Amino acid sequence: MASHIVGYPRMGPKRELKFALESFWDGKSSAEDLEKCQLILGIHLKQMSDAGIKYIPSNTFSYYDQVLDTTAMLGAVPPRYNWTGGEIGFSTYFSMARGNASVPAMEMTKWFDTNYHFIVPELGPDVKFSYASHKAVNEYKEAKALGVDTVPVLVGPVSYLILSKPAKGVEKTFPLLSLLDKILPIYKEVIAELKAAGASWIQFDEPTLVLDLESHQLDAFTKAYAELESSLSGLSTLIETYFADVPAPAYKTLTSLSGISGFGFDLVRGAQTIELIKGGFPSGKYLFAGVVDGRNIWANDLASSITTLQALEGIVGKDKLVVSTSSSLLHTAVDLVNEPKLDQEIKSWLAFAAQKIVEVNALAKALTGHKDEAFFSPNAAAQASRKSSPRVNNEAVQKAAAALRGSEHRRVTNVSARLDAQQKKLNLPILPTTTIGSFPQTVELRRVRREFKPTRISEEEYVKAIKEEINKVVKLQEELDIDVLVHGEPERNDMVEYFGEQLSGFAFTANGWVQSYGSRCVKPPIIYGDVSRPKPMTVFWSTAAQSMTQRPMKGMLTGPVTILNWSFVRNDQPRFETCYQIALAIKDEVEDLEKAGITVIQIDEAALREGLPLRKSEHAFYLDWAVHSFRITNVGVQDTTQIHTHMCYSNFNDIIHSIINMDADVITIENSRSDEKLLSVFREGVKYGAGIGPGVYDIHSPRIPSTEEIADRINKMLAVLETNILWVNPDCGLKTRKYAEVKPALENMVAAAKLLRTQLASAK
């Protein structure tokens, strides 16, 4: 019985890659210094080898993103980056990822329904593909030099094309799969080099097989792997899927592919896939059974997994069953060893990446008759304690959440009348300007927060320092003449963790970091029990900020769906139950802010879209409870209180009616990196009556947009949106940027809004 890991986190146990990247981008270190991060790879390879894993992945390390690595491998560099051929280096690679002073970055979007982001390839009929990055082969050779024979992992050719988009100037209807014949020769070159280097297995990640694919897309898999079959001769080939069930038609296509040795499935989220396997699995093929959750931090229920694996063993045979993770461990934290302060009982319920590889191997050994009772017994005890712990169960919270069913929780007055009442109170100009919430977090500010937590500075010193920072942010916004202000969130390290720390039912890690994009990591809270709010969370800071200005000051909250989707969520009850509990806690906070005189309250639902199930058949149920949760938070406020929400990654065309159904007064949406895809919804006739602020510039790039560029973007919006509902704002919070970038960008944004106001007044 063998063991396999789909992929492993890249950042390192203490985020070594993050700091190396940021040092390189800031010009403080060399390319050679950055390349030393390959040492992280060596540590991880040894970790998996020492744990007894047989099939260890390589080429899952990346300096930014595995899809971008594939774009580099294929030489599919958009012309604006002025790449002239040859091996793609850091300059071109990071320009594609982040933009540079003269050109914007490529689009970034969610990787399926995770909080990881990939760089979307821009393709068309004129792309001249060439083998331009030998990373996959080089990493295999480096691992081999360390004495570890690995399974090189490539993003599969069909998923790569399905996840791409037509480049600028290419018809939106361009059939991306028509490029298969152009990219397969490069895959053949890579395969040939891997064979020559001594590889015996190769893994193609084809996660799009879990989506609702059309027949021509499924046919592309048959075509691609038939074309690659002779090149793959002599290699054992695994096709890996993850994140959901594989639909029956895709399962049939996948398991019928010739020349493929094994198939990997997510059996944590894929209960229906197990039924398909029971209904028929090709004889002589390997089944890589993903029974250890790659996306969460809960210890595996080993007894339950053994039962599942034994049933599968009866179908495929002992020598063809491989125990695996459900997905890459990229989506979980790195190592529990780095959590000495975590509560011991809660810690016993958890497993991070380093622990999950041990679980995988323990399951594989148990199936061969070598069950390690010293490992299995504590696991069984932890599973039992989690079910019965009073820390998990709060009857009052469960009753309050259950009482929510059967009501719409909708504000009585319609949005149009509410906006009129709010305008009378707020007296804003047309095209009002605002920002999304956070302002840059300086080294000094982080030091203050860091020293307050272990009480190296007093509460009085801490409050004084944070108030000074808020005052600085307020004064800057007033100087810039922004209409609706924010306090800049200097007291917050993270928009979810900040709230979770003040809610019951949450636990926190010191080093539970997970990559979001590039060097950006998040440290998701762990929701282990029923959720409630013991006391107000933001009222003190919001009222302090409002006292510093006559302009409206937004109260800033994170919405229940985003808290849910950006946390490691308990897996012992439905997600919607947990979401309703969080919604009730946020509702209490909204009402306390209103009582304290805050007239504009933003409830961010940045992650609403990313929680959307991968299957269309499951969308309606998710959207129903997600939108309902948002409405619960603000159903009790007055008509004159303006409720804002913010959303990230504006691929919203398919859920626009649910967004309208949220019944917010104003929605701001990240839009600038998606070529105004959002605006196409309104061009197609969808009527939106609330305020809306599609982002006018990309905060993920250091590039400072000109006034003319922003004005041009606003004009495009005015072509499809009413003047009286359009807001002008950046597309996301400014926390990760520097003041030297933020100030001129906001100056240009306000100037663009004023320019348009003047032009609109003249036109009247």
Swiss-Prot record:
Keyword line: Amino-acid biosynthesis, Cytoplasm, Metal-binding, Methionine biosynthesis, Methyltransferase, Transferase, Zinc
InterPro entries reported for this sequence: Cbl-indep_Met_Synth_N, Cobalamin-indep_Met_synthase, Met_Synth_C/arc, UROD/MetE-like_sf
Catalytic activity field: 5-methyltetrahydropteroyltri-L-glutamate + L-homocysteine = tetrahydropteroyltri-L-glutamate + L-methionine
Cofactor requirements of the protein: Zn(2+)
Disulfide bonds: none
Residues annotated as binding L-homocysteine: I436, G437, S438, E489, D604
Domain of life of the organism encoding this protein: Eukaryota
Molecular function terms from GO: 5-methyltetrahydropteroyltriglutamate-homocysteine S-methyltransferase activity; zinc ion binding
Gene3D superfamilies recorded: 3.20.20.210
Pathway where this protein functions: Amino-acid biosynthesis; L-methionine biosynthesis via de novo pathway; L-methionine from L-homocysteine (MetE route): step 1/1
Residues annotated as binding 5-methyltetrahydropteroyltri-L-glutamate: K18, N115, D494, Y517, R520, C521, W566
Stated role: Catalyzes the transfer of a methyl group from 5-methyltetrahydrofolate to homocysteine resulting in methionine formation.
Protein name: 5-methyltetrahydropteroyltriglutamate--homocysteine methyltransferase
Species in which this protein is naturally found: Plectranthus scutellarioides (Coleus)
Gene: MET
